[in-house]
Regions:
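Basic, amphipathic "hinge/linker" alpha-helix immediately C-terminal to the N-terminal HTH DNA-binding motif
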Residues: 22, 75-99
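Recognition helices and adjacent regulatory flanks at domain boundaries
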Residues: 1-10, 20-24, 46-47, 100-102, ...
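Short, contiguous, well-ordered secondary-structure segments
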Residues: 1-3, 7-8, 17-20, 32-33, ...
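N-terminal helix-turn-helix DNA-binding core of bacterial DNA-binding proteins
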Residues: 12-55
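Canonical helix-turn-helix DNA-binding module
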Residues: 45-74, 78
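C-terminal regulatory/oligomerization modules of transcriptional regulators
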Residues: 94-139
Length: 139
């Protein structure tokens, strides 16, 4: 039995994926990390999304437990935890892109020009991951 088995309601792949990322806050935290380079509890707490501290703490622990993020203390700051997306977490980039595009066309236009003017989703996907990795590589 894997650690993820307790999250799943049934054997349906879509339902299983939603059991992991389908709550109100998980993809918000991933989006904050991926697109806005948020890394600390304080940065997440101060975001426009207004995530309650208890919910944020729970989501960060869950994301770490299932391998979407890792928690580290930086050499120059041993007091603050920094959170980084793993390859598994980065694999949600296409989901974030699709949700943003769907919202742009059906609910609310996005103010991110990269997303609003996307011509090639795969190219955008790779650019977002490269930007994330380049911003976190120096830490």
């Amino acid at each position: 039995m894997s650690i993820l088995d307790k999250f799943f309601r049934c054997n349906c792949p879509v339902t299983s994926a939603l059991d992991i990322v389908g709550d109100k806050w998980t993809l918000v935290v991933i989006k904050l990390m991926l697109l806005e380079q948020k890394k600390t509890f304080k940065e997440f707490s101060e975001s426009d999304e207004s995530i309650a501290p208890s919910i944020l703490s729970n989501r960060l622990k869950t994301l770490e437990k299932i391998g979407f993020i890792v928690k580290q203390k930086l050499p120059d700051n041993q007091k603050t935890n920094h959170y980084f997306l793993t390859e598994k977490g980065l694999s949600l980039t296409p989901v974030i892109i699709e949700l943003a595009l769907w919202s742009h066309h059906n609910i609310k236009p996005v103010d991110n020009q990269d997303l609003a003017n996307v011509k090639d989703k795969n190219e955008l996907h790779l650019a977002i991951i490269e930007r994330y990795k380049s911003k976190t590589a120096t830490l």
